Amino acid sequence: MQFVLRKIMQKAEDAFSACTIDLIAAVQSNHSVQVLLNYFQTEQENIDNRITDFFNELSDYLENFQHYRITVGVSSEVESFEQISTAIEMSKEAAASRLFKGNGRRIEYCQEPHTLFSPKDFQNEYEEFAKAVETMQPDACQYQIHKCFRLASDKALFASEFYAMGLWLLRSTYDILEIADTFDVDVQQEVLENLSTVADLRDYVIRQVQQLIKESRSERENRERKPVLEAIVYMKEHFTEKITLEDVA
C-alpha cells in the first residue's frame, strides 16, 4: 500500500510541477494522497486538462494491482491562503462522500448529489434481465445483474447513480413479477444507502431478486396445484365408500 501511495505521489509531482508555482504532495492516513497546487489563473485550463489526464493515468496504473481503484476529488479554487484548509476539506468530501469506496472519477466538489443514472444506457442489459426474471431463472438474473454493475463501473458512475441503478433493478423485479404493490421504496432506499461498497450493493440486489423469484415461483406453483388439491379433497369427501367383491356379486 505504501509503495502504491508513494508512486501516486511521484506521479502527481510529475504531472503538475511544470505548470504550478508551488506543489505539495503528501500521504494522508495511509490510504490517500493529498496534492495542493498553487498556480496562476491563466493556467486554469491547462490544470484542468492535466487533472483529467492524471486520473486516466492512475486508473491505467492501478489496473496492475488487484483490488485497487482510484477516486479523485477536486475542490473548487480558492484565492487566499486562509482558504486552504477549506479547500482541503472540500477535496476530501468530493473524494470520500460522493463516490463508493473503490470506484470513481475526477469530480468537482458540490453540495448537490449527482443523479445522472439513465436506464436507457442499460437497455440491452435490462431486456436480458427482464427475460431472466420473467422466466424465473435465478442464476441468469445474477449474471445479468453482474453485467449491469460491470457496465456501471466501466462508465464510472457516481455513488448516487449506483444507488439509483440498484433501486431500479429491484423495482423492475417487482413490476415484472406483478407484485409492485408490495414494493416499499422508502424501506429499500434506506437499506441501500446503508451499504458502503458497490460489491455490497450488487450482492444485496442479487439476493433480493433471487428471493423474490423463489417466493413468486412457490406462490405460482401453489396456485397451479390448488385446483388439483381441491379435486382430491372433493374425491375423498364424496367417493370414500369401498366397493367389495361381495357387493359386486
What do the PLM-derived regions correspond to, one by one?
Residues D14-A249:
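Cytosolic nucleotide-utilizing catalytic cores of signal-transduction proteins
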